């Protein structure tokens, strides 16, 4: 958001952080991941996050290990095999993941993968990128939850906007300081 604010100021337009955040939230309603990446290994993870005072949710995220593209991220009120299965079905609808190998950290995921006809195995070493992504989402949500109402729909819009930023704009040192979709020539 700071880059957007700086760019606006460069053009002589002064906008507050809250206004720019509102733009991101508004855009998130219209953003669809309309790209296809050749997928080889996908790391999947879930993490509990704090929304409002007493409300918690589970963040589910999937990222392609090699390209660093965030494939899907969403919130669920529950954790377990059924929400994991629902998440994987959504991922399968959005991307061609049938031939990809899923790296997971729990037996519940293996059952969910089998239920949606996907394959994977337990892996605790090559999943660092999805763990780091979950940590980043959690940190950003806790840092910025005061600028939005903290509800799950609001957090989901923020999650969509941040996933767009991560895939299209955020440079990654491991990708020669390019965003993931630029590095795989899809932006």
Where in this protein do the model-derived segments appear?
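Acidic/histidine-rich, metal-coordinating catalytic segments
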Residues: 98-110
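Active-site beta-loop-alpha junctions of metal-dependent nucleic acid enzymes
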Residues: 73-97
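DNA-recognition alpha helix
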Residues: 1-13
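RNase H-like two-metal-ion nuclease catalytic core shared by retroviral integrases
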Residues: 122-142, 153
């Amino acid at each position: 958001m700071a880059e957007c604010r700086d760019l606006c100021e460069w053009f002589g337009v002064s906008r507050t952080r809250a206004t720019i955040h509102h733009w991101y939230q508004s855009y998130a309603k219209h953003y669809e991941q309309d790209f296809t990446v050749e997928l080889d290994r996908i790391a999947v993870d879930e993490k509990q996050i704090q929304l409002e005072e007493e409300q918690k949710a589970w963040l589910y995220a999937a990222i392609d290990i090699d390209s660093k593209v965030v494939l899907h991220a969403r919130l669920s009120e529950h954790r377990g095999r059924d929400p994991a299965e629902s998440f994987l079905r959504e991922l399968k609808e959005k991307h061609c993941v049938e031939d990809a190998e899923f790296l997971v950290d729990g037996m519940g995921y293996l059952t969910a993968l089998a239920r949606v006809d996907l394959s994977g195995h337990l892996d605790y070493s090559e999943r660092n990128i999805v763990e780091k992504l979950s940590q980043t989402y959690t940190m950003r949500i806790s840092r910025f939850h005061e600028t939005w109402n903290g509800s799950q729909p609001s957090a989901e819009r923020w999650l969509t906007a941040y996933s767009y930023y991560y895939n299209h704009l955020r440079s990654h040192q491991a990708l020669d300081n390019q965003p993931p979709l630029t590095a795989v020539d899809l932006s």
